[in-house]
Amino acid sequence: MLEQLRFPHEIAKDIAKQEKNKRKKRKLTQAELSARSGVSLASLKRFEQTGEISFVSLVKIAMVLD
């Protein structure tokens, strides 16, 4: 059972990977997603690389991609 436990940063990176895949599937650049979502380009890049993002920004991105 302990093998199933994951750390928050691992989950965050997985979410970032999923959102990046959605962005690419929709053929959006980071700049386009930034403009459509209202999330700064720097924040979006950091999110895709590290998984770090505010909850509000994550919701904004999800609203564009989902």
Question: How would you describe each model-predicted region?
Answer:
Residues 27-45:
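Short alpha-helical DNA-recognition segment
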